C-alpha cells in the first residue's frame, strides 16, 4: 500500500510539473516567435527604428512590393523601404521609396545601370528592347532599358536617333559628319554640320525614321519634294556622276547611259537638262567598275 501511495503521489507531482513546465515552455516560445506573432497587427509597423511591413504571422516582409496610400514600396532583404534605387534593374523608387511611373530617369554611370536615359512606363517598368512613342516622337530602348542614341541598325533599316539630349528618330534631311565610305558604328553619334561644311554627308529619313537606302552595290532612286535623288547602301545621298543602271541602253557602246549626273555635294538632284560641268563620267571612280 505504501508503494501504491507513493506512486499516486508521484503521479500527482508529475501532473503538476507537467502543467508548470508547459506554462514555462509557452513563455519561452513566445520569446522565440517573430515580432508580432502573438497579436501584433498586420500591416505597416515601426520595428527597430524603421518602418516595416508585418504579415499575418507576425513576420517581417522582405524583398516584396507593398502598397500604402495608393503607392507601391519595395521592402529590401532587411524589410526596410528601399529609396532612390533601382529594383531588379526594372523599377525605380524615389527618395521616399515610392515606385516611379511615366517619368524619365538619368543615370550618370555610377550605379548598377549604364550611363544614359531610361523611361518608366505606366506600370513602373522600364521600357526595354522596344520602340515607344512619347508625345510626338518615337524613342528606341535597348535590352537594359537605356534610351538608344546615335546610329541604330534594325531589321536591315538605318535610323539616326541624335545625341543623348535627343534620342528620338530624326526625320527629313540631315547633314551629318561622315566619310560616306562605311557605316558609322552602332550607337555612335555624328555631329550635325552646317550644309557645305567639310566632312559631312546628306541623309534622308522618312516619317518612320528609316533612312532611304539601297541594297549593297546599287543605288535607290527616291522622289522627294518633286525631285529625284539616289542613295547608296549606307543611306548617303549620291552626288556627281554615278553608275545607277546595270545595263546600258541599246546602241550605247560606251556604257555612258548607265550614268546619271546628280550635281554637286549639296545638290544630289537628278539633272535632266543641259549643263556645262568640268566633272566627266570617266573621272568617276565608278567608271572603271562599270
Label every PLM stretch briefly:
Residues 2-290:
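Extracellular adhesion/carbohydrate-binding repeat motifs centered on closely spaced tryptophans
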Amino acid at each position: 500500500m505504501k508503494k501504491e501511495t507513493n506512486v499516486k503521489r508521484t503521479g500527482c507531482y508529475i501532473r503538476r510539473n507537467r502543467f508548470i513546465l508547459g506554462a514555462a515552455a509557452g513563455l519561452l516560445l513566445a520569446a522565440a516567435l517573430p515580432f508580432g506573432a502573438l497579436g501584433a497587427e498586420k500591416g505597416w509597423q515601426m520595428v527597430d527604428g524603421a518602418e516595416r511591413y508585418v504579415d499575418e504571422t507576425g513576420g517581417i516582409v522582405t524583398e516584396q512590393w507593398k502598397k500604402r496610400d495608393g503607392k507601391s514600396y519595395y521592402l529590401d532583404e532587411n524589410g526596410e523601404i528601399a529609396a532612390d534605387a533601382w529594383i531588379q534593374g526594372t523599377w525605380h523608387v524615389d527618395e521616399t521609396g515610392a515606385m516611379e511611373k511615366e517619368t524619365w530617369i538619368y543615370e550618370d554611370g555610377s550605379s548598377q545601370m549604364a550611363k544614359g536615359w531610361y523611361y518608366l512606363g505606366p506600370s513602373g517598368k522600364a521600357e526595354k528592347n522596344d520602340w515607344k512613342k512619347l508625345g510626338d516622337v518615337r524613342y528606341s530602348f535597348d535590352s537594359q532599358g537605356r534610351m538608344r542614341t546615335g546610329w541604330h541598325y534594325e531589321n536591315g533599316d538605318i535610323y539616326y536617333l541624335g545625341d543623348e539630349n535627343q534620342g528620338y528618330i530624326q526625320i527629313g534631311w540631315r547633314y551629318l559628319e561622315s566619310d560616306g565610305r562605311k557605316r558609322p558604328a552602332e550607337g555612335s553619334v555624328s555631329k550635325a554640320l552646317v550644309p557645305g561644311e567639310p566632312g559631312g554627308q546628306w541623309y534622308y529619313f522618312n516619317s518612320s525614321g528609316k533612312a532611304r537606302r539601297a541594297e549593297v552595290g546599287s543605288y535607290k532612286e527616291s522622289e522627294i519634294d518633286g525631285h529625284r535623288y539616289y542613295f547608296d547602301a549606307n543611306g548617303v545621298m549620291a552626288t556627281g556622276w554615278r553608275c545607277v543602271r546595270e545595263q546600258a541602253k541599246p546602241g550605247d557602246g560606251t556604257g555612258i547611259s548607265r550614268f546619271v549626273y546628280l550635281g554637286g555635294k549639296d545638290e544630289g538632284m537628278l539633272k535632266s537638262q543641259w549643263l556645262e560641268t568640268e566633272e566627266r563620267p570617266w573621272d568617276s571612280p565608278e567608271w572603271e567598275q562599270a
